[in-house]
């Protein structure tokens, strides 16, 4: 059960990382929108000067448009959680296959093959959970 708990912890860590990245992206977005809003008249003046129009003659006629920021969508944590959930599911299925094979007294080669597959899966999950940290 150790690797399984590790996967659950890694999934939670992935969700927390994804949430943190989403919050950071949202802050950058708000800062961008504020910068654009705060400089809209200055940008309009530069545009008018570049077009050869006297900005004072156009005073009060409008400002440069302020682009809207992007919409945040955090999928990093949910992708890791989904991947680790699939790995946990596969690990439990391999464990069940091993138990079934032992109960049915299959040949030792079949049990060994299932054990090898399970051990490889455990190593992969441990490696993946270390990368997430």
From Swiss-Prot:
One of its GO terms (cellular component) is viral capsid. Its main location: virion. Belongs to the microviridae H protein family. GO terms for biological process: symbiont entry into host cell. The keyword Transferase does not apply. It comes from the Viruses. Probably triggers with protein G the injection of the phage DNA into the host upon conformational changes induced by virus-host receptor interaction. The keyword Cytoplasm does not apply. Keywords: Capsid protein, Host-virus interaction, Viral genome ejection through host cell envelope, Viral penetration into host cytoplasm, Virion, Virus entry into host cell. This is Minor spike protein H. It is found in: Virion.
């Amino acid at each position: 059960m150790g690797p399984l708990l590790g996967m659950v912890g890694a999934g939670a860590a992935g969700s927390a990382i994804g949430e943190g990245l989403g919050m950071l992206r949202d802050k950058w977005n708000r800062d961008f929108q504020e910068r654009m809003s705060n400089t809209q008249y200055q940008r309009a003046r530069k545009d008018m000067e570049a077009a050869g129009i006297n900005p004072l003659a156009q005073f009060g006629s409008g400002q440069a448009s302020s682009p809207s920021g992007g919409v945040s969508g955090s999928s990093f944590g949910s992708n890791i959680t989904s991947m680790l959930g699939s790995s946990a599911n596969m690990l439990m299925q391999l464990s069940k296959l091993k138990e079934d094979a032992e109960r049915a007294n299959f040949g030792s080669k079949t049990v060994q093959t299932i054990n090898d597959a399970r051990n490889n899966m455990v190593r992969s999950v441990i490696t993946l959970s270390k990368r997430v940290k």
